[in-house]
C-alpha cells in the first residue's frame, strides 16, 4: 500500500516534470516568436521611416534646386534688362554724338568759309592800308612843305598841347572830386556826431579832491587827534590821506588825490566815530576791514558798469579794474563815468555807420582801463590798457582801439577812429572837465605865442576855449602855398610843445584886398 503510494507519487512527479518541461518549451517558443515578430515590425517601421525621410530630403532638395533656379532666372532677367537699358543709352549717346558731329562738321564748313572771307578782307584791307599810307605820306610831305616842320616836330608839339590840356582838366576834376568827397564826409560826420551827442543825456557831477565827514560834536575832534596826535597820525599812516580838522566846525576834511584812499579813510573814520573806540590798534583793524569791504564794492561797481553798458563776457580781473576807475579822475572827470559815456557814444555812432555795435561799446568801455594801474606801471595809459586787454584775451580790434585812442599807435581801423571821436566828445564837451582859470589863460597865451613866432603872421586869436586858433597872415609876404605849409608847421609845433585834451584846430587866413577909385 505504501509502495503504491510511493509509485503514484513517483509517477506524478515524472508526469509533473514532463508537463513542466513541455510547458517551458511552449512558453519559450512563444516568446521567441513574439521577439521575431517584434524585430520584424521594428525593421519594417525603420525601413518605412527611412523611406519617408528619404522622400522628405528629396523633396527639400528639389525645392531648394527650384528656388535657386528661380533666383538665377530672376538675376539673369535683371542682367538682361540692365544690358538692354545700357544698349539703349549707348544708342542714344551714339545718336547725340552723330548729331554733334554733324553740327561740328557744319560749323567747320562755316568757319572755313568765314576764314576765306576774312582772308579776302585782310588782303583788301592791306591794299587799302598801303594806299592810305601812301596818301598820308603824300599829305605829310605837303604839310611839311607848307608848315616848315617835320612830322616828328609836329607830333611833339601836338603831344605837348594835349598833355598840358589833359593835366589841367584832370587837376580840375581831381579838385572838384576831392572837394565834393570832403564836403560829403564832413557833413556825414557832423550828422553822426550831432546825433550821438543829442541822443546821449548822461548825468555828470564834478569830482572833488576832498571829502567831508560830519562829526556828532566838536569834542570828537580831540578824540580823533588823540593823545599827542597819535590817533590822527595812525589814521593818516594807515590810509595815506591828510586829515584837516580845525577849518570847519564839527567837520573833518579828508584830502587826497586818490578817491580810493579817501573812500577808505571816510569809511574807517565813520565807523570809528560810531564805535567810539579810537586808538592806533583799533584804527589799523578798522582800516584793514574797510579796505576788504571796498574791494567787494569795487567788483560790484565794475559788474554794474558792464551791465549798464550792455557789455558781457569780460574777464573778472578787468571787471575789478573797471570798478577801480570809479575812484579815478581826469581833469576832475570821473573816469568810469567817462568810460560809460564813451561806450554809449561809440554804440550810437557805430549804429549810424553800420558797424558792430557790441564791439564798439566794448572798446569804448575798456579804452581807459590802463588808468586803473598807470600809477603802478610805467608808460602811457593807452598802451598799458592794450597790454591788459591782450593779457585777458580781448580781440585784436579791441586791443588796437585801446592802444590808438590817444595816437600812441596810428589808428588803422574804423573802430579805433570811432573810439577816438567818442573819447574827444566826452572829454571836450563844455563842463566835462575843469581847469584852473590861470591854467586856462596860460594855455591860451601859449597857443597865441607859438603862432605869433612864425614869420609873416600878423594877428593870432585863440577861440572856442582854446580848441581853435585862427592865424592872420600878411598877404604880401606869404603866398597860398606858404599858407598851407605854415598851417602844418604851427600844428606840429603845438603838438610838440603843449599838452591838451582832444584836438586843436589851426586855421590860417590869407586875405588880399584890391582897392580902386573911379573918378
Curated annotation (Swiss-Prot):
Which ranges carry the HD domain? 335-428
CDD domains with a match to the protein in the record: HDc, KH-I_RNaseY
What Gene3D superfamilies does the record tag this protein with?
A: 3.30.310.210, Hypothetical protein af1432
Q: Where are the transmembrane segments?
A: 3-23
Recorded hits in InterPro entries, A to Z, give: ATP_synth_B-like_membr_sf, HD/PDEase_dom, HD_domain, HDIG_dom, KH_dom, KH_dom_type_1, KH_dom_type_1_sf, Ribonuclease_Y
Family that this chain belongs to: Belongs to the RNase Y family.
Entry function = Endoribonuclease that initiates mRNA decay.
Q: What is this protein called?
A: Ribonuclease Y
> What species was this sequence derived from?
Nitratidesulfovibrio vulgaris (strain ATCC 29579 / DSM 644 / CCUG 34227 / NCIMB 8303 / VKM B-1760 / Hildenborough)
The top of its lineage is: Bacteria, Pseudomonadati, Thermodesulfobacteriota, Desulfovibrionia, Desulfovibrionales
Amino acid at each position: 500500500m505504501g509502495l503504491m503510494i510511493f509509485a503514484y507519487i513517483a509517477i506524478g512527479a515524472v508526469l509533473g516534470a514532463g508537463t513542466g518541461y513541455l510547458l517551458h518549451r511552449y512558453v519559450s517558443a512563444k516568446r521567441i516568436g513574439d521577439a521575431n515578430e517584434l524585430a520584424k515590425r521594428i525593421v519594417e517601421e525603420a525601413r518605412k521611416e527611412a523611406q519617408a525621410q528619404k522622400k522628405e530630403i528629396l523633396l527639400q532638395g528639389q525645392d531648394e534646386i527650384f528656388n535657386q533656379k528661380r533666383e538665377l532666372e530672376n538675376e539673369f532677367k535683371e542682367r538682361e534688362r540692365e544690358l538692354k537699358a545700357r544698349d539703349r543709352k549707348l544708342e542714344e549717346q551714339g545718336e547725340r554724338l552723330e548729331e554733334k558731329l554733324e553740327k561740328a562738321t557744319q560749323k567747320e564748313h562755316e568757319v572755313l568759309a568765314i576764314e576765306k572771307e576774312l582772308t579776302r578782307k585782310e588782303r583788301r584791307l592791306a591794299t587799302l592800308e598801303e594806299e592810305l599810307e601812301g596818301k598820308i605820306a603824300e599829305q605829310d610831305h605837303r604839310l611839311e612843305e607848307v608848315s616848315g616842320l617835320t612830322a616828328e616836330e609836329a607830333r611833339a608839339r601836338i603831344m605837348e598841347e594835349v598833355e598840358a590840356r589833359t593835366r589841367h582838366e584832370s587837376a580840375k576834376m581831381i579838385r572838384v572830386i576831392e572837394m565834393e568827397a570832403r564836403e560829403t564826409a564832413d557833413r556825414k560826420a557832423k550828422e553822426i556826431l550831432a546825433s550821438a551827442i543829442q541822443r546821449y543825456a548822461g548825468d555828470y557831477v564834478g569830482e572833488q579832491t576832498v571829502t567831508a565827514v560830519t562829526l556828532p560834536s566838536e569834542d570828537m575832534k580831540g578824540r580823533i587827534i588823540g593823545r599827542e596826535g597819535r590817533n590822527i597820525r595812525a589814521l593818516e599812516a594807515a590810509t595815506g590821506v591828510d586829515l584837516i580838522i580845525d577849518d570847519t566846525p564839527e567837520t573833518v576834511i579828508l584830502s587826497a588825490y586818490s578817491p580810493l584812499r579817501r573812500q577808505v579813510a571816510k569809511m574807517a573814520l565813520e565807523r570809528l566815530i560810531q564805535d567810539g573806540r579810537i586808538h592806533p590798534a583799533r584804527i589799523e583793524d578798522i582800516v584793514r576791514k574797510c579796505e576788504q569791504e571796498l574791494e567787494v564794492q569795487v567788483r560790484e561797481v565794475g559788474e554794474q558798469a558792464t551791465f549798464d553798458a550792455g557789455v558781457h563776457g569780460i574777464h573778472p580781473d578787468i571787471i575789478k579794474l573797471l570798478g577801480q576807475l570809479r575812484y579815478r579822475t581826469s581833469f576832475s572827470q570821473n573816469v568810469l563815468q567817462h568810460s560809460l559815456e564813451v561806450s554809449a557814444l561809440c554804440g550810437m555812432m557805430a549804429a549810424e555807420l553800420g558797424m558792430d555795435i557790441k564791439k564798439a561799446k566794448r572798446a569804448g568801455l575798456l579804452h581807459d582801463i590802463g588808468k586803473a594801474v598807470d600809477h603802478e606801471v610805467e608808460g602811457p595809459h593807452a598802451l598799458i590798457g592794450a597790454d591788459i586787454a591782450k593779457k585777458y584775451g580781448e580781440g585784436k580790434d579791441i586791443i588796437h582801439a585801446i592802444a590808438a585812442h590817444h595816437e600812441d599807435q596810428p589808428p588803422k581801423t574804423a573802430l579805433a577812429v570811432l573810439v577816438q571821436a567818442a573819447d574827444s566828445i566826452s572829454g571836450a564837451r563844455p563842463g566835462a572837465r575843469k581847469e584852473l582859470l590861470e591854467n586856462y589863460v596860460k594855455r591860451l597865451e601859449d597857443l597865441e605865442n607859438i603862432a605869433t613866432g612864425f614869420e609873416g603872421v600878423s594877428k593870432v586869436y585863440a577861440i572856442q576855449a582854446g580848441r581853435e586858433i585862427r592865424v592872420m597872415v600878411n598877404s604880401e609876404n606869404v603866398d597860398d602855398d606858404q599858407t598851407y605849409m605854415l598851417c602844418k608847421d604851427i600844428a606840429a609845433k603845438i603838438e610838440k610843445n603843449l599838452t591838451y585834451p582832444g584836438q586843436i584846430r589851426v586855421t590860417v587866413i590869407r586875405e588880399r584886398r584890391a582897392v580902386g577909385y573911379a573918378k
